[in-house]
Each structure stands twice: as structure tokens, then as C-alpha cells.
Amino acid sequence: MVFECTPELRAYIEKSGKNCILVEMVEVNNSDLEISELHVRFADRRTREIFVEKKRYRTVETDFGEVLLPRFPLQFEETVTFSLRSVLGIKSVRHKGIKI
């Protein structure tokens, strides 16, 4: 498994200093509906500490920073690519190659 990022994301990481990407599963459990979805976002130092120490997320070092992954099994393609998305000036991370 190889983690890559697009040049736009790499430039944003260098400019902003946000070099930790968090991959977490968000679950909505309602009486009529159950939804599980991956949520990928930047994590600050405090959030990183919470997810590594308390939630036992594993850390993968990459050439562009760290990726925090949950302990439960996810399906990874051979190459996982992270890219930058910008909507109305708000930056977020997209992923390709990770499935629940």
C-alpha cells in the first residue's frame, strides 16, 4: 500500500503546516436508517494525540506527513491518493483508494 498526494495538496501542506491526515469512520444509527461513511480531514496536534493515544489509531509515515488510520479493517487499493478540494475557499481532503 502506497500513499500519494497531489501537487496541490503537497503545496497546501507546506504552506499551512497541516501535515497530519485523519481517516475516520462516521456512523449514523437511527431507528430507520444506518449509515457508515469515511471522513478524511486534517488533524491538529491535539486531535492527533487523542486519536493515537485514546482511540488507538495507527500512524503511517509518508513523504508528505502522517496518515492516521483506524484499527478496524478497511479495504485499501494498491495506491491511495489524497487530493485537495476547495469549496467557497474552504479546504478539505479527498481520498481515492480506501473503502469500508
Residue ranges and their predicted role:
Residues 1-29, 33-100:
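Domain-level signature for proteins that mediate thiol-based redox and metal-cofactor handling
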